[in-house]
Every structure is written in C-alpha cells, then in structure tokens.
C-alpha cells in the first residue's frame, strides 16, 4: 500500500506527521469519495512529486473516473482562484473587489460529482494554498448544504497533514543530494 510506503518515508523527527498521516487517511470517517478526492486534490496542491506519486494510485483505485477527474479539477481551479482571490483580499484598495473577475470557472458549476464533494475538495485545497476568502466561501456553501463542522475539519486536517508530509519529504530529498 502506497500509504504505508509514504508513512515509512517520513523521518523520525517528524514522527507526529507519520502518525497523523495514518489517522487522517487510514482512520477517516469520511465516505470514500470525499476522503480520496480530498487526498488527491491536496496531494496535487502540495506540489510534492513524492506525495503525489505515492497517493495517486490509491486515490484512483478508490474513486470513480468522474470523481478522479473532478478532484484533479478542484486542485486546478483552486490553484488559480486561490491566487486571484487571496490577492484581491490582501490588496488594500477595495476597488479590486468590485471589478469583474473575467476568469472562467465553469467546473465549479458543473464538476461532474456531487456539489458537496467538490466544495469539500476545494476547501481543502484552499487550506493548502492559504486563501481565507476561498475558505470562507466554500465553508459557507458546505454549511448551507448541511455539512457539519467535523466533516469540514476532517478535510482541512487531511490538507494540513499532506502539506506537511510533502514539505518534509521534499526537504529531505534536497538535503540528501
């Protein structure tokens, strides 16, 4: 199992990450589609080749072709939106908030899977990318759809752990050169 290989690669100084990786993925209460879509989207967002290589096959095996594509779409569209909306939010000139975005985001309206799942994946990727405005927006949509806080927190816990593991393993790879 790739998850076990990934856990084994985490150095002892980051043992907490190893344990967290096992618990947030291996013991998650999320339905399989929500879990593995979150894992795949966050692995892509982490920008860690090792993490993506290790987790993608298991995600693909646990997702329908439509969900697999939608999770990748969530990572792709949020890569754009998180930069755009975070920048708009951080600029001190509020006029930028009144301007038309002018960016295509059709996949958000028609993701090919349940809207709640796509929103959850988008929230998790927004956590990795640090866009507060996007986090608030996706959290509100999820809450209005009846998703509880525990489920939402589960998604951003997965995001946090995958990001941390990616950072750690990428650093170790550079230090080993």
UniProtKB/Swiss-Prot annotation:
> What organism is the protein native to?
Streptomyces avermitilis (strain ATCC 31267 / DSM 46492 / JCM 5070 / NBRC 14893 / NCIMB 12804 / NRRL 8165 / MA-4680)
Q: What is this protein called?
A: Alkyl hydroperoxide reductase AhpD
GO terms in the biological process aspect are:
cell redox homeostasis; response to oxidative stress
Spell out the Pfam families in the cross-references.
CMD (PF02627)
Task: List the active site.
Answer: 131, 134
Q: Name one GO molecular function term.
A: alkyl hydroperoxide reductase activity
Source organism superkingdom: Bacteria
Q: What class of enzyme is it?
A: oxidoreductase
**Record InterPro entries:** AhpD, AhpD-like, AhpD_core, CMD-like
Catalytic activity, as annotated: N(6)-[(R)-dihydrolipoyl]-L-lysyl-[lipoyl-carrier protein] + a hydroperoxide = N(6)-[(R)-lipoyl]-L-lysyl-[lipoyl-carrier protein] + an alcohol + H2O
Q: What does this protein do?
A: Antioxidant protein with alkyl hydroperoxidase activity. Required for the reduction of the AhpC active site cysteine residues and for the regeneration of the AhpC enzyme activity.
Q: Which residues form each disulfide bond in the chain?
A: 131-134
Which family is it part of?
Belongs to the AhpD family.
What does the subunit comment say?
Homotrimer.
Query: EC annotation?
Result: 1.11.1.28
Q: Which UniProt keywords apply?
A: Antioxidant, Disulfide bond, Oxidoreductase, Peroxidase, Redox-active center
């Amino acid at each position: 199992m790739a998850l076990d290989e990934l856990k084994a690669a985490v150095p002892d100084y980051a043992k907490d990450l190893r344990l967290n990786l096992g618990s947030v993925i291996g013991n998650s209460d999320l339905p399989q589609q929500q879990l593995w879509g979150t894992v795949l989207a966050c692995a892509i967002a982490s920008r860690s080749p090792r993490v993506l290589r290790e987790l993608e096959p298991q995600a693909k095996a646990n997702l329908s072709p439509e969900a697999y594509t939608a999770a990748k779409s969530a990572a792709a569209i949020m890569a754009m939106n998180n930069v755009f909306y975070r920048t708009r939010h951080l600029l001190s000139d509020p006029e930028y908030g009144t301007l038309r975005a002018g960016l295509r985001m059709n996949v958000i309206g028609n993701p090919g899977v349940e809207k709640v799942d796509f929103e959850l994946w988008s929230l998790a990727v927004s956590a990795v990318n640090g866009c507060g405005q996007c986090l608030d927006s996706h959290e509100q949509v999820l809450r209005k759809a009846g998703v509880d806080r525990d489920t939402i927190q589960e998604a951003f816990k997965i995001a946090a752990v995958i990001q941390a593991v990616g950072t750690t393993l990428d650093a170790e790879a550079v230090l080993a050169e």
